[in-house]
């Protein structure tokens, strides 16, 4: 809980809608940096060939599309059981569930973007409820556009912020 009188120094809590709108816009901007290049790709569907194409365009590379091809996620293999996966276990489950959306890399990227957008919005919602937190520092950071759809780190960030909120409320 914040020290007495510090809320007056910070001012009133920001309204949630502008924070959510800004975070959503940044995530969608990140997807817009990557999706057109991904959809325009006409080369061989291998991780290396796609990476060469994506890296020729600033901001277009994403682990999401790379690992879809590298790990054959369109065939829905189970991370850690069917192939080695370098991300934490809950991320592996997230990646596996998202793989059932479609068998194309573009559809998988868009599905993952939608799920990551939901995680970003939940993170903003939780940050807004933590005493002393400044949710603008998350919702307005340009890094959200650059890294929000780079990989699945928003899952861990969202879970951490929810844990902090629950801890503050005494639900540890």
Residues of each region from the PLM?
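TM-lumen/periplasm interface segments of multi-pass membrane proteins
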Residues: 1-131
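Residue-level signature of the transmembrane alpha-helical core
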Residues: 114-117, 136-140, 162-163
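Transmembrane-helix signature of polytopic, membrane-embedded enzymes
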Residues: 124-144, 158
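Short acidic/glycine- and proline-prone juxtamembrane loop motifs at membrane-interface regions
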Residues: 148-156
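Specific aromatic-rich, kink-prone transmembrane helix
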Residues: 156-172
């Amino acid at each position: 809980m914040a020290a007495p009188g510090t809320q007056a120094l910070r001012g009133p809590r920001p309204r949630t809608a502008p924070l959510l709108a800004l975070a959503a816009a940044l995530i969608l901007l990140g997807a817009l940096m990557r999706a057109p290049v991904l959809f325009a790709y006409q080369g061989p569907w291998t991780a290396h060939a796609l990476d060469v194409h994506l890296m020729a365009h600033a901001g277009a590379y994403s682990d999401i599309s790379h690992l879809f091809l590298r790990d054959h996620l369109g065939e829905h293999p189970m991370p850690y059981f069917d192939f080695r996966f370098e991300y934490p276990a809950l991320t592996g489950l997230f990646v596996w569930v998202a793989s059932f959306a479609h068998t194309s890399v573009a559809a998988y990227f868009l599905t993952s973007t939608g799920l990551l957008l939901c995680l970003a919005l939940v993170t903003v919602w939780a940050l807004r409820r933590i005493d002393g937190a400044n949710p603008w520092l998350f919702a307005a950071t340009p890094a959200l556009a650059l890294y929000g759809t780079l990989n699945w780190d928003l899952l861990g960030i969202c879970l951490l912020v929810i844990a902090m909120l629950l801890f503050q409320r005494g639900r540890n």
